[in-house]
Amino acid sequence: MSLVLQARRSGKYFLLIDNLLVVLGFFVVFPLISIRFVDQLGWAALIVGIALGLRQLLQQGLGIFGGAIADRVGAKPMIISGMLLRAAGFATMAVASEPWILWASCTLSALGGTLFDPPRTALVIKLTRPHERGRFYSLLMMQDSAGAVIGALIGSWLLAYDFHYVCWAGAALFVLAAAWNAWLLPAYRISTIRAPVREGMLRVVRDRRFLTYVLTLTGYYMLAVQVMLMLPIMVNDIAGGPGAVKWMYAIEAALSLTLLYPIARWSEKRFRLEQRLMFGLLLMTLSLFPLGLSTTLQSLFALICCFYLGSIIAEPARETLSASLADARARGSYMGFSRLGLALGGALGYTGGGWMYDMGRSMNMPELPWALLGIIGMLTLALLYWQFSLQVPCATHQPRSS
């Protein structure tokens, strides 16, 4: 086996373990924020929505800067410092007794993610070949789902004792992830050239196709982030307690572990990336319209299953399509900027979702926020169809970056 092949293989194993630690650390804490501050402390959903939206907007919106710096200095120092900063954010959240403290903790967490997320994503592109990238993304997403339910189970168990333990567990996992990277991650360069930070950023913003694609995904992310805000609140309301929330993530894990990889392999041979992304988004959108009318856990979980299935179809295609559009000369910058749609969609989805949920409750119209989200999904589908119809379809197996 050549040294290059050996490095790729060991690198992929490293990425899987690193990803598991990051996912566990995140999902121990974040799914329980809305339950802790809305249901247990009685804060308005809007306040918590602002905190979650602020985290999303800062982390993903500033990602291009983190990616551009990583293009210049390499992945390792950015990843380690970012993980330690997120650990500090979680430790601060443990003592959040006022909204501004919660917002500050989410800001620290966001800045940490700004540093470590783009170089980690760029490493996936560097260490995988184009033809295997989609399947590796599927493996990572399967791991995300399993890690999400395990993290939520750990967090729910710790929440029964004290929310402090939830935050400290999340912080400890990110410190462990930082130590893992400090010990084993080589000093990889994630781009083919070592260009100035400004040059990498300019290369991205001049790429009109990539820019349009990223901004169009804002609506997609407005739907996707409700897994962290409105869906847990609704499950909690119908069940009468937070214990059922872990089953929501268990459903996602079961579907992902059994269907994600087979669906990705089957569909990549038969459909273009654009078609897979749009069909998944359509399924997510259609599942939202009747969600507000659910009165039992059975009907609610059935619709959540449809939502997750749409995400299972769309996510590998979306991630692979983003990688295929990235320029290898500025991988970090491209992967950082690719999160801008998540930044905007997350901020709007969290703050708007919290506001719509409060509004629907005050007007005794629980279906209102879900209907509005469904309309947003339909508009996003129309924009994606228009964008893809004007461009040459992206090949499934031959991305530009390698």
UniProtKB/Swiss-Prot annotation:
Gene3D superfamilies attached to this UniProt entry: MFS general substrate transporter like domains
One GO CC annotation: plasma membrane
Localization of this protein: Cell inner membrane
Tree of life domain: Bacteria
TM helices/strands, residue ranges: 13-33, 34-54, 99-116, 139-159, 165-185, 214-234, 244-264, 277-297, 340-360, 368-388
Membrane topology: Multi-pass membrane protein
Alphabetically ordered keywords of this record: Cell inner membrane, Cell membrane, Membrane, Transmembrane, Transmembrane helix, Transport
Record SUPFAM superfamilies: MFS general substrate transporter
GO molecular function, one term: transmembrane transporter activity
Pfam families (alphabetical): MFS_1
PANTHER family: MULTIDRUG RESISTANCE PROTEIN MDTH, RESISTANCE PROTEIN MDTM, PUTATIVE-RELATED-RELATED
Name of this protein: Multidrug resistance protein MdtH
Organism of origin: Edwardsiella ictaluri (strain 93-146)
